[in-house]
């Protein structure tokens, strides 16, 4: 009789789930690109924090929510495009985090630097992350300590962070501030690249960039998928005080993150 390895069985179950999440991210991305390439008028409104939201955000969100509800109906979902009673969410140990269109500003600028972000949180830790950049047709994924990159439905390859003699520092294209400006003035040895959305995390994870500093506020759906991918690729994501970004809702007062940095060092 063939012996069944319990851990291999569990691992295979999670790998199959990851594959489904990757397919779901692609489906949302294809919807985004259909609207990106169309001549249809895109309705834009603004949230209280003055960030834009469009019909495209909602369309992608509906695809992801429906898909996640079929894949794992027992796991609740937190999406950027929904409203939640935070006190109820505080009791969730496991939940999905979704940003259906990360980089709406980049989408509206037509520069291609926008992504679909999906991650799974278990007891405050992002254990699974998927980032799909539909304009470039590149997908990044991670589960625990393994991270991969797949281009244009090609072969999936493992990725790892990499150090460099002349580190590349990647920063937000649309969120400059005075603290970042002062920081960059002190970092003379680094090359600097501006990039939109969670692609900054991906550049760290694949070894192209080495440092991603963020001083302004973000939300947990902005960072969780990228966090999972960087950690799985051997990097780190920490607050400026040296702590870990924590996604445990019971220890938070809101969905907002303070500043952090991701790095290969």
Swiss-Prot record:
Record-level GO BP terms: 3'-phosphoadenosine 5'-phosphosulfate metabolic process; phosphatidylinositol phosphate biosynthetic process; sulfate assimilation
Keywords: Cell inner membrane, Cell membrane, Hydrolase, Magnesium, Membrane, Metal-binding
SUPFAM superfamilies, sorted: Carbohydrate phosphatase
One Gene Ontology term, aspect cellular component: plasma membrane
Cell membrane found in the keyword field: yes
Gene3D superfamilies xref list: 3.40.190.80, Fructose-1,6-Bisphosphatase, subunit A, domain 1 (3.30.540.10)
InterPro entries noted in UniProt: CysQ, CysQ/Inositol_MonoPase, Inositol_monoP_metal-BS, Inositol_monophosphatase-like, Inositol_monophosphatase_CS
Family, as annotated: Belongs to the inositol monophosphatase superfamily. CysQ family.
Protein name: 3'(2'),5'-bisphosphate nucleotidase CysQ
Provenance organism: Buchnera aphidicola subsp. Acyrthosiphon pisum (strain APS)
Gene name linked to the record: cysQ
């Amino acid at each position: 009789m063939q012996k069944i390895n319990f851990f291999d069985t569990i691992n295979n179950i999670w790998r199959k789930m990851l594959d489904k999440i990757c397919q779901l991210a692609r489906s949302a991305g294809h919807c985004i690109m259909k609207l990106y390439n169309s001549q249809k008028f895109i309705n834009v409104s603004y949230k209280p924090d003055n960030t834009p939201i469009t019909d495209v955000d909602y369309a992608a969100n509906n695809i992801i929510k429906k898909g996640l509800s079929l894949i794992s109906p027992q796991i609740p979902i937190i999406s950027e495009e929904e409203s939640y009673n935070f006190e109820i969410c505080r009791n969730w140990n496991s939940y999905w985090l979704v940003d259906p269109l990360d980089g709406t500003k980049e989408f509206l600028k037509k520069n291609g630097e926008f992504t679909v972000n999906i991650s799974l949180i278990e007891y405050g830790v992002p254990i699974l992350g998927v980032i799909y950049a539909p304009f470039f047709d590149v997908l990044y994924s991670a589960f625990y300590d393994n991270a991969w990159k797949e281009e244009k439905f090609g072969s999936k390859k493992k990725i790892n962070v990499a150090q460099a003699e002349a580190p590349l520092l990647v920063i937000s294209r649309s969120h400059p501030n005075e603290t970042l400006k002062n920081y960059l003035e002190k970092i003379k040895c680094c090359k600097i690249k501006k990039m939109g959305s969670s692609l900054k995390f991906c550049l760290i994870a694949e070894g192209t960039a080495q440092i991603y500093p963020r001083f302004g506020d973000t939300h947990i759906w902005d960072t969780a998928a990228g966090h999972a991918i960087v950690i799985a690729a051997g990097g780190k994501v920490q607050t400026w005080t040296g702590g870990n970004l924590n996604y445990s809702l019971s220890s938070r007062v809101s969905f907002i993150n303070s500043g952090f940095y991701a790095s290969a060092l």
